[in-house]
Regions:
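Structured soluble/peripheral alpha/beta segments that form catalytic or ligand/cofactor-binding pockets
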Residues: 1-282
Length: 282
């Protein structure tokens, strides 16, 4: 497990009809010389994935620059942010990977050649005061997936996430929900330190102070409490679950569709040792 400074970037897309989804994620550990690369593609009910936790990384730190590039050479993959962290203008991404068709993860290549590319254009940053060193941006994505010779068009709302931290990753339990749609979005994080996040409904943003979710299931009703005392419910349905080994434990994620306070949204719900989270305060 890598324990030094780290910085990550991630592009997430789930089509409004739930038929196509993509996530491309880098996590750089420049002090350790290691890059993690994750990529998952959903095509109907088929999930393809590639992960590797042992790719090289140079010693430069990307997050604070006037632009940032997260990249690997073999295999070839890239997320390139234009503009600084607080003033990004776009993020371009691409990857050419040999993926495996499976939901239960193991690291390394598969036997299906997949390429992805596209451009993410930001619309607004969600919850800028939520947590130091992390950026959650909702925007528009245009791109394509080429899977087994078939071209899948990507066009619609998406999410960009970038984060840096000095403390080790995947030590403390957490639950992470991110949802987005034309009229609503949210990000909510539960950890031992408490629950934080932000929700945007019809153009008005509120701070999330409570985040409660039942155990992993195909359908879950998630409770969000807002700072102004209003309760907000997200009814979440899993499109496809994903699991990955990290050390001796298992990270669990999922592409989802949902309603957020009655608004149609899509997104992801990811968990790490969630059964070890303390119950939220009443």
């Amino acid at each position: 497990m890598n324990r030094g400074y780290s910085e990550s970037a991630m592009v997430m897309y789930v089509a409004a009809d739930g038929e196509t989804a993509l996530t491309l994620r880098f996590c750089r550990f420049p002090d350790d010389g290691v890059t993690w690369l994750w990529c998952h593609v959903l095509d109907g009910d088929r999930l393809f994935g590639f992960t590797d936790h042992d790719l090289p990384c140079d010693g430069a730190r990307a997050f604070d620059g006037p632009a940032a590039a997260y990249a690997t050479v073999a295999p070839t993959a890239l997320i390139e942010r234009s503009g600084s962290d607080g003033a990004m203008t776009e993020a371009r991404f691409s990857a050419g990977l040999l993926m495996a068709e499976r939901a239960a993860g193991r690291h390394g290549p598969g036997d299906t050649r997949v390429s992805v590319n596209g451009v993410f254009t930001p619309r607004y940053s969600l919850g800028e005061a939520v947590a130091e060193g992390r950026r959650e941006v909702v925007g528009a994505l245009v791109g394509e997936i080429v899977l087994g010779g078939r071209r899948l068009r990507l066009e619609g709302l998406a999410k960009y996430h970038e984060q840096r931290q000095d403390t080790p990753r995947f030590i403390e339990p957490f639950r992470y929900l991110c949802l987005w749609g034309p009229t609503a979005s949210c990000v909510a994080i539960a950890s031992r330190a408490g629950q934080i996040g932000a929700a945007m409904l019809d153009g008005a943003e509120s701070v999330v102070t409570r985040f409660v979710a039942p155990p992993i299931a195909d359908a879950r009703s998630v409770e969000l409490g807002l700072r102004d005392g209003i309760g907000l419910r997200a009814d979440v349905r899993t499109l496809k679950a994903i699991s990955l080994p990290i050390g001796s434990e298992t990270w669990r994620g999922s592409f989802v569709t949902a309603t957020l306070g009655g608004h149609a949204v899509t997104g992801m719900l990811n968990e790490w040792q969630a059964d070890r989270l303390p119950p939220p305060a009443s």
